[in-house]
């Protein structure tokens, strides 16, 4: 199960030997173990481990990760700090409107443009961060969209320890805020007793 999950995850998101991640979640957490450790090692990428939460930004600047694996609570905390700083800059709210317009551009080009517009935000994350993988709980769609506006490629997924653990996930090409993606290769999903949502 674990090996097939690694292969399936790497079909959803491109991770190369040139990539680096900064690990902040405990390795006994199955999501971190799969997404932040086994998949990274299998792809030949590098892992740095944070020194402490109080030194997280310093660790980002030192290790310059290209991929960040997080849970929604951590992204919510980081998000509130970023948005507060962006809005504090003269014209900061206008930058967010520009960021929203940029996300309507096609694919990777929109992320490249947004990363230039929000260069200071990207510098705080070491200047190399491209992709944020989020799992273990639902990510607020507004936070998802704000990270996209800032020029980050956000992918969400869902799973259980019993599914080793990832069973559905966004792919690099199919991303919809407020969702967790489609079943990964080798997985099937079925909604039982659907409600209005």
Kindly label every feature range from the protein language model.
Residues 68, 109, 113-197:
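Conserved AMP-binding/adenylate-forming
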């Amino acid at each position: 199960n674990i090996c097939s999950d690694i292969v399936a995850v790497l079909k959803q998101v491109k991770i190369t030997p040139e990539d680096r991640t900064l690990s902040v979640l405990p390795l006994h957490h199955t999501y971190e173990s799969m997404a932040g450790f086994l998949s990274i090692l299998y792809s030949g990428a590098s892992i740095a481990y944070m020194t402490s939460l109080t030194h997280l930004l310093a660790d980002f600047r030192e290790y310059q990760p290209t991929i960040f694996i997080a849970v929604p609570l951590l992204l919510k905390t980081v998000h509130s700090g970023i948005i507060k700083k962006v809005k504090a800059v003269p014209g900061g709210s206008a930058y967010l409107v520009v960021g929203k317009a940029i996300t309507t551009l096609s694919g990777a080009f929109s992320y490249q443009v947004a990363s230039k517009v929000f260069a200071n935000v990207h510098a705080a994350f070491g200047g190399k961060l491209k992709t944020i993988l989020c799992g273990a709980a639902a990510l607020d769609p507004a936070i998802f969209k704000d990270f996209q506006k800032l020029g980050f490629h956000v992918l969400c997924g869902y799973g259980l320890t019993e599914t080793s653990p990832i069973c559905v996930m966004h792919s690099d090409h199919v991303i919809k805020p407020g969702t967790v993606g489609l079943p990964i290769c080798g997985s099937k999903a079925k909604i039982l007793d659907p409600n209005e949502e």
